[in-house]
């Protein structure tokens, strides 16, 4: 963890998407190719579990997307169907969220060193991370799905422009993408979909899913907005 490798992060939303598509599709293809071999290998259980979790971690985006889509009709069912009390048992699944939150807290603590700085950075950035992760779930789930289907796609490199300070320019470069993918418009529709979930929560005065729907709405809206904005800047 102390080995530093200088690298340039994606400078625009379309560059980030091309990187994420390549990583997630490649991860799914790798899991498809050697997943069963790892499961059947004569390895200690802890190593096998670690390997399987690492190989199949890209499928998380599929489950994030499915969970998000189902959350809106579930809110309606919860408030319209009589004696539908199964939701009180669903809180056990929050354990997964606690594990993720703790993992990112520890990584922030290792970087920031002091508790005060860690809490300041963590409280402001972790919700943004969750929102962006949810907003990218449609795009990344599509990449994973195509990887599992074995569909061949072109290898699209992440654009690099040697951006080292705020004065460097990445806009209108030939290497940047200007074409708008149909998925972008779906992301815009999903932002409206989760906005309806927020409105429904206030209508029913049921705020249990409100933070989840607010993160989903914010994430999809941000991804949609910056995908369009950066495409127009590069056209």
Model-derived regions, located:
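Alpha-helix initiation/capping motif
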Residues: 1, 12, 141, 179-182
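Extended catalytic-interface subdomain
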Residues: 1-99
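Nucleotide-sugar-dependent glycosyltransferase catalytic core
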Residues: 7-26, 118-123, 127, 152-170
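General secondary-structure edge motif
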Residues: 11, 36, 114-115, 121, ...
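Loop-to-transmembrane boundary segments
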Residues: 40-63, 163-195
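Membrane-embedded multi-pass helical conduit in multi-pass membrane proteins
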Residues: 57-154, 160, 181-235
């Amino acid at each position: 963890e102390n080995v530093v490798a200088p690298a340039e992060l994606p400078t625009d939303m379309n560059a980030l998407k091309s990187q994420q598509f390549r990583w997630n599709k490649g991860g799914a293809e790798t899991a498809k190719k050697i997943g069963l071999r790892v499961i059947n290998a004569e390895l200690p259980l802890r190593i096998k579990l670690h390997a399987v979790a690492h190989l199949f971690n890209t499928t998380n985006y599929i489950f994030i997307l499915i969970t998000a889509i189902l959350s809106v009709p579930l809110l309606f069912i919860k408030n319209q169907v009589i004696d539908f009390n199964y939701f009180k048992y669903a809180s056990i699944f929050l354990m997964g969220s606690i594990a993720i939150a703790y993992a990112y807290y520890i990584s922030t603590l290792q970087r920031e060193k002091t508790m005060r700085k860690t809490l300041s950075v963590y409280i402001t950035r972790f919700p943004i991370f969750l929102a962006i992760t949810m907003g990218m779930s449609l795009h990344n789930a599509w990449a994973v799905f195509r990887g599992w289907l074995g569909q061949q796609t072109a290898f699209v490199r992440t654009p690099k422009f040697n951006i080292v300070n705020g004065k460097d320019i990445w806009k209108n470069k030939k290497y940047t993408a200007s074409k708008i993918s149909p998925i972008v418009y779906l992301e815009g529709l999903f932002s409206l979909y989760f906005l309806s979930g927020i409105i429904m929560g206030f209508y029913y005065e049921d705020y249990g899913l409100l933070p989840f729907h607010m993160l989903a709405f914010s994430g999809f809206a941000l991804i949609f907005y910056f995908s369009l904005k950066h495409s127009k800047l590069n056209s």
